[in-house]
Amino acid sequence: MQKALKLGSFFARSAISVKPTLATSKMTQLRHFSHGASVFDIDSVEDFTEKVIQSSVPVIVDFHAEWCGPCQALGPRLEEKVNGRQGSVLLAKINVDHAGELAMDYGISAVPTVFAFKNGEKISGFSGVLDDEQLDDFIEDVLAA
């Protein structure tokens, strides 16, 4: 049912790493400002603790990479669905190439990997790309938990 892009433990063993360039930094900055009010980027463990763990509403966390085709397919659809929920759920975007410590802390070995947090606890998740109906069901389950 769930398809995953298996990349091995590319963070923990430094097998693959993308170095930010001026072009990708500018892309990230532009994309950052295109998020809706319910979507934000996470760049550090401190940021994660403040915006995800301490959040009073459920937060969906999207571990992704700029070079990942499935991530590029999932990310905008997930953003659109979360933005359509008028703040009842938030979306935190974590670029694994810029926040490797968080990726290692959560055992990310494939991207995209998505987790849901509620009241500071991880409650569910998936790896790979889901269709629109599956995404809607996932968000509904997060809200109902």
UniProtKB/Swiss-Prot annotation:
One of its GO terms (cellular component) is mitochondrion. The keyword Disulfide bond applies. The record marks D62 as: Deprotonates C-terminal active site Cys. Disulfide bonds join C68-C71. Residues 39-144 form the Thioredoxin domain. Keywords: Disulfide bond, Electron transport, Redox-active center, Transport. The record marks G69, P70 as: Contributes to redox potential value. Transmembrane segments: none annotated. GO terms for biological process: cell redox homeostasis. SUPFAM superfamilies: Thioredoxin-like (SSF52833). The active site is at C68 (nucleophile), C71 (nucleophile). Belongs to the thioredoxin family. Participates in various redox reactions through the reversible oxidation of its active center dithiol to a disulfide and catalyzes dithiol-disulfide exchange reactions. This is Probable thioredoxin-2. The lineage of its organism: Eukaryota, Metazoa, Ecdysozoa, Nematoda, Chromadorea. The gene is trx-2.
